[in-house]
């Protein structure tokens, strides 16, 4: 298969993965309207082309939370990444480090913190959920500190799991799920050998280390489902802000008032995110929510954005809408599933090339210059229709 654009990796991943894994990463909540709008709304963002601007000197690097990034991109936390490639979190982290950007390890990763952190030279980020088991949360924070994690990404948009109907059809959940997954693995021998056999153990490393026993896929679903905490409020996060002395980012913000609450809480950054359309179907796409949030809190903390980003052009669009940086989730998992570390490195190379083209043709010499001025007048007027 010819890979000429970041989007090509999706088809490559689908060909390689058992359906339960492909649809788990590819799908969204309910009828998946928000999942689709994340992509389509971002594609509708029209940029303002400029010419004769002497674009011989482009600078993609940026500073974020005391780190220098080769470009304003980080790999997002994605659960079960180690099921998409052999020891997938390690491969993805190495790819990110090789391209000079951060990797964010998920709470529900296959590879534990202690396996991933020593595999790379640059510090990684760590994502944590709000869970009823505060002992687990404290244990995870202590281990992250000990491993040299610099930035904590705190996910707050999962007080309850989203209804992901596609999972029941694909075999991730639903009737006879274990049998269906086994049969799918048999019909995908490359994955079964490389990941299914050579990629063991497949337990949830961070959770297993705390529980003292292996945590397989079925155990994970039950444990996590029992630990979602719908009673959580801002006051319940105060002990974490006191415990964690490094940068702290609140992930899952879609409303300007919640963004202002994050500022009052003392967060160093937020991620404008609808969890990739995997939680509440029918909410705003990140691209539609971002301008009002940027109007409300820009300059008071760092604004990151995710959901729907499939190219370097999309990265520039998000920056023009008000983000300081973006997180890539599905896009890197597709590349990882298709070609491992090399696939993710190539994906990031493609993202960088596409950013350079977009910046050259919008007359923006550096990341700091990418602003609403890079948007077409029509797009600016549309963004202004959603007020904070």
Curated annotation (Swiss-Prot):
Q: Where does FMN bind?
A: 106, 127, 155, 251, 306-330
What is the E.C. number?
1.1.-.-
Catalytic activity of the protein: (S)-lactate + A = pyruvate + AH2
Q: Does the keyword Nucleotide-binding apply?
A: no
**Cofactor list:** FMN
Is Cell inner membrane found in the keyword set? yes
GO MF, any single term: FMN binding
Q: Where does substrate bind?
A: 24, 129, 164, 278
Query: Where are the catalytic residues?
Result: 275 (proton acceptor)
Q: What does this protein do?
A: Catalyzes the conversion of L-lactate to pyruvate. Is coupled to the respiratory chain.
Q: What is this protein called?
A: L-lactate dehydrogenase
Q: Which organism is it from?
A: Xanthomonas euvesicatoria pv. vesicatoria (strain 85-10)
